[in-house]
Amino acid sequence: MSFPYSLKPFNTFGVEQSCLSMIEVHSKAELQSTCLSLYQSKRPMLVLGGGSNIVFTDDFNGTVVRVLTKGISCSEDGTHFYLAVEAGENWHELVQFSLNQNMPGLENLALIPGTVGAAPIQNIGAYGVELCDICDWVEYLDLESGNLLRLTTDECEFAYRESIFKGSLRDKAVITAVGLRLPKAWHPKLAYGPLQSFNAETVTSREIFDRVCEVRSEKLPNPEELGNAGSFFKNPIVSAATYMQLAAHFPSIVGYAQPNGEVKLAAGWLIEHAGLKGFALGNAGVHAKQALVLVNLGHATGQDICRLALHVIARVNEVFGVKLEAEPRIMGLTGETSLDV
């Protein structure tokens, strides 16, 4: 089966699949009317931002709605800057905008691919900062009522790579805008890896931004050169007891203590030390510089990528007894599906 609209330019893995129809929306009103019409018609619909967190395993027998809405408005009070951002804005460009406006707080999240509207769905995060730390509200279209509604940060039920939009509002909501709240009393977040060498008293937000961009550019391949979706696996969270057992057998294991006493393990370390860094299965491979990233080595299909992911999960579980979970959405013929394609 082949549909008329190619999806290859609209997914960063560069997988060659197609869809039945495609609509580009440039305004919030257009986004509302388009999505409501499709939802009420009960036809398969996929709302797509940057396509940086998705694996197409088949042609999509429905309509892809590309969100291209733009707009950033800023306000402030005595303690905070506030940004209201339309869903179609590019996330990294928003980070640059905020720094250029002397509104620090987003620098740790530099170079994360995708759009602002996609950011709350999986509560994007990097280098010790998550969206939930700076999110004020999320506005969404309720597909059942047709109303625009707004959730506070608490109501979004954010967790590690999780939110209400992956839970009870999955397939029922389309994010239209996101509100951010940045403290004027800025404090650098330097707990992770390459940022630990900075002096908290003297470092600037621009220096953190530059370092994050430098490190991400070194480790993460440019999707235009080597198709990928960034980090493919979530960093698994284990109990303190499990971590101690693992550390006894693998003294160099990388883990980060969590506020609740659990430990977040570095999935990239687990994959590398399971002997899979640079491993390839057909046209899909584990990136040679960053084992957390799966790449399209040429003409990989979505099935190739999923098969490789399942192999990585099985091998890491075999070596460490830890089960990895995939981050990207796996999209089949009529909607979201599982890795086991």
UniProtKB/Swiss-Prot annotation:
Which GO molecular function, any one, fits this protein according to its record?
UDP-N-acetylmuramate dehydrogenase activity
Q: What is its EC number?
A: 1.3.1.98
Q: Which GO terms describe its cellular component?
A: cytosol
Q: Which GO terms describe its biological process?
A: cell division; cell wall organization; peptidoglycan biosynthetic process; regulation of cell shape
Pathway(s) of this molecule:
Cell wall biogenesis; peptidoglycan biosynthesis
Enzyme class per UniProt: oxidoreductase
Catalytic activity line of the entry: UDP-N-acetyl-alpha-D-muramate + NADP(+) = UDP-N-acetyl-3-O-(1-carboxyvinyl)-alpha-D-glucosamine + NADPH + H(+)
Give compartment(s): Cytoplasm
Specify the FAD-binding PCMH-type domain's residue ranges.
13-185
Q: Active-site positions, per UniProt?
A: R161, S231 (proton donor), E327
Q: Which cofactor does it need?
A: FAD
**Organism superkingdom:** Bacteria
Q: Which PROSITE patterns match?
A: FAD_PCMH
> Which keywords fit this entry according to its UniProt record?
Cell cycle, Cell division, Cell shape, Cell wall biogenesis/degradation, Cytoplasm, FAD, Flavoprotein, NADP, Oxidoreductase, Peptidoglycan synthesis
Q: What is the annotated role of this protein in its UniProt record? A: Cell wall formation.
Q: Matching PANTHER family, A to Z? A: UDP-N-ACETYLENOLPYRUVOYLGLUCOSAMINE REDUCTASE
Family to which this protein belongs: Belongs to the MurB family.
| Name listed for the protein in its UniProt record | UDP-N-acetylenolpyruvoylglucosamine reductase
Q: What is the lineage of its organism?
A: Bacteria, Pseudomonadati, Pseudomonadota, Gammaproteobacteria, Alteromonadales
